[in-house]
């Protein structure tokens, strides 16, 4: 989904009050104690985008990575948004010796509605690029590593977003072009450093 997570504050209060079992009752075989929303939901959010203050749960949807932990823990209180679609990952493989390798996120969100023309257009662009750039018996993921992921982003017309970074601050594959940099390559670096002194 693309839009905000829907929150039912009454159901949140019911979870905190013990009326509803967390995880839809999946852990009901044993007494785990009183449900602690701070420890079991807010504290386990990977981006820290949730807060629970004075009986109200709020989510900073801009920073949410949609891991779905909160939704799985409180399914009656939290629901996914209405604008639904798909993410497209490319370049995955499962070789016997190395084990399965996850694909790279290419399209964070695309509307997946019949007749799926938007999805087909992206896939056809990838196929054309792969047929032109790929070597004999070379997989898409190997072509992406050899030519560069940024080239695939350009071919599909996808703008780089933070979700494309798999390892922050570790050899980025997104490089800026001169027209994207304010002042271009010819700006005075000493002037820039004056404005950004530590």
Curated annotation (Swiss-Prot):
SUPFAM superfamilies: Nitrite and sulphite reductase 4Fe-4S domain-like. It comes from the Bacteria. Keywords: 4Fe-4S, Iron, Iron-sulfur, Metal-binding. GO terms for molecular function: 4 iron, 4 sulfur cluster binding; heme binding; metal ion binding; oxidoreductase activity. Residues 55-83 form the 4Fe-4S ferredoxin-type domain. [4Fe-4S] cluster binds at residues 45, 64, 67, 70. The keyword Iron applies. Part of the complex that catalyzes the reduction of sulfite to sulfide. The alpha and beta subunits may have arisen by gene duplication. They both bind 2 iron-sulfur clusters, but the alpha subunit seems to be catalytically inactive, due to substitutions along the putative substrate access channel, and because it binds sirohydrochlorin (the dematallated form of siroheme) instead of siroheme. Heterohexamer of two alpha, two beta and two gamma subunits. This is Sulfite reductase, dissimilatory-type subunit alpha. It comes from Megalodesulfovibrio gigas (strain ATCC 19364 / DSM 1382 / NCIMB 9332 / VKM B-1759).
């Amino acid at each position: 989904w693309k839009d905000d997570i829907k929150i039912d504050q009454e159901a949140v209060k019911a979870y905190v009050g013990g009326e509803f079992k967390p995880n839809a009752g999946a852990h009901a075989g044993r007494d785990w104690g009183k449900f602690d929303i701070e420890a079991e939901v807010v504290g386990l959010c990977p981006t820290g985008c949730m807060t629970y203050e004075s009986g109200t749960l709020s989510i900073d949807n801009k920073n949410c990575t949609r891991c779905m932990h909160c939704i799985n823990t409180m399914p009656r209180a939290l629901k996914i948004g209405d604008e639904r679609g798909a993410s497209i990952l490319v370049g995955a493989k499962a070789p016997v010796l190395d084990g399965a390798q996850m694909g790279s996120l290419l399209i964070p969100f695309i509307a997946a509605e019949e007749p799926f023309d938007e999805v087909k257009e992206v896939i056809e662009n990838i196929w054309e690029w792969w047929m032109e750039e790929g070597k004999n018996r070379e997989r898409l993921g190997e072509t992406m590593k050899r030519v560069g992921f940024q080239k695939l982003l350009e071919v599909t017309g996808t703008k780089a977003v933070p979700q494309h970074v798999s390892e922050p601050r570790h050899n980025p594959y997104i490089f800026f072009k001169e027209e994207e940099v304010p002042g271009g390559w010819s700006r005075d670096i000493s002037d820039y450093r004056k404005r950004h002194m530590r």
